[in-house]
From Swiss-Prot:
Residue list for modification Phosphoserine: S20
Transit peptide: first to last position: 1-19
Main localization of the protein described in the UniProt heading: mitochondrion
Protein species of origin: Pongo abelii (Sumatran orangutan)
Role noted for this protein: Glutathione-dependent oxidoreductase that facilitates the maintenance of mitochondrial redox homeostasis upon induction of apoptosis by oxidative stress. Involved in response to hydrogen peroxide and regulation of apoptosis caused by oxidative stress. Acts as a very efficient catalyst of monothiol reactions because of its high affinity for protein glutathione-mixed disulfides. Can receive electrons not only from glutathione (GSH), but also from thioredoxin reductase supporting both monothiol and dithiol reactions.
This protein's name: Glutaredoxin-2, mitochondrial
Similarity comment: family membership: Belongs to the glutaredoxin family.
SS bond partners: C74-C77
Keywords, alphabetical: 2Fe-2S, Disulfide bond, Electron transport, Glutathionylation, Iron, Iron-sulfur, Metal-binding, Mitochondrion, Phosphoprotein, Redox-active center, Transit peptide, Transport
Subcellular location: Mitochondrion
Residues that, per the record, bind glutathione: K71, Q106, V118
């Protein structure tokens, strides 16, 4: 398990245009540093290995207005993705069961949200719940305003760049 964490720490989750996920080396320098023994503290190295999935999740959430952490065989996940498709809202999906390190991501999501079930849905950087919670927000008329709020923020950021 430790070798998996070490491999995870040196990589970054990326998505292709087709929507598939894969791992990309974060930096060759990280591997060189570890190989040369320049790690100053074993406990801080282990701490970094523990936080790598959390950091990658947070980066994904901050880069996208809607993120659905899902599993391909989950009917609730399918229901949540359909809701956003029907609303004509772009979303980023991370299929945990297709990732080599999906269990570590699910553990990190548990630490962040208090639950291991999927889907885990984030809108505008905030965890809103699972499929049932998302449908409830939609029926109450609160979901679309959250999504629009995010798109407005992102468009304003682009104006000032």
């Amino acid at each position: 398990m430790l070798w998996r964490r070490a491999a995870l720490a040196g990589t970054r989750l990326v998505w292709s245009r087709s929507g598939s996920a894969g791992w990309l080396d974060r930096a060759a320098g990280a591997a060189a540093t570890a190989a040369s023994g320049m790690e100053s503290n074993t406990s801080s190295s282990l701490e970094n290995l523990e936080t790598a999935p959390v950091n990658q999740i947070q980066e994904t959430i901050s880069d996208n207005c809607v993120v659905i952490f899902s599993k391909t065989s989950c009917s609730y996940c399918t229901m949540a993705k359909k809701l956003f498709r029907d609303m004509n809202v772009n979303y980023k999906v991370v299929e945990l069961d297709l990732l080599e390190y999906g269990n570590q991501f699910q553990d990190a999501l548990y630490k962040m949200t208090g639950g291991r079930t999927v889907p885990r849905i984030f809108v505008n950087g905030t965890f809103i719940g699972g499929a049932t919670d998302t449908h409830r927000l939609h029926k109450e008329g609160k979901l679309l305003p959250l999504v629009h709020q995010c798109y407005l923020k992102k468009s304003k950021r682009k104006e000032f760049q």
